[in-house]
Amino acid sequence: MINTYVSYQLIAKDIGKSLDRVQNQPVVERETEYYLENITKVKSIKEFVADDRLFRYAMKAHGLEDMAYAKAFMVKALEGGVEDKDSFANKLSDKRYKEFVNTFNFEAYGDTATLFTKAQQGTVDKYLRQTLEENAGDQNEGVRLALYFERKASSITNAYEILADPALKQVAFTALGLPDSFGNADIDKQAKLIEERIDLEDFKDPELLSKFINRFTTLWEINNPTVSAASLVTTLFTQPEYGISTNLLLTMQSMKAY
């Protein structure tokens, strides 16, 4: 089995082709065709949630598939919109709900909400990316986490956003070598440490973000090996273009001993 580090690189180095492969999957093709054919027919929140197939596609596109059953909850979020800073969606710590409501902003645009690109092809693009990440996770959870972090990182504005998102938190804790038990510490203490050790502005620089994710995937593999330690080291030494130095490898080997 290919290790986490290499698996991530194979997908990320040509994300366009990776997404094309997802788009050509028969199930994805059928669901996407249905979505695009029907979304512009939706004129209200009631109609939106009534079409379960359509609604589930939209929810999955925003990483909320597990909440597709909670229609009353989502109706409340949609009815409140995002214009009012005190709206239900804006008050939720999980930003995915706000993003969803912003995409399908019936509160602001009424029966024209689904005519915007973000509700049509924009949602399809998100669905394809979400499916790509989920497919990767079926083989290796570390790859899914890396792809998710890559997608979200540039929009992170503070450490609390990392802590509020389980996937972002998992990546940050792993990359920083923090034990899961640290998650039980006072939330302000957690945020302070993260902001001391990570310059969030670095995530707006593709090269610096890549280095951070490379560190995560390598440490994830050490903690959750898909291949032997010897094979991992051999693979990394033969992949110099990915920027893992000998010193970093030696450091990570010593970390494994603890």
Map each language-model feature to its residues.
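Type III/flagellar secretion export determinants
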Residues: 1-258
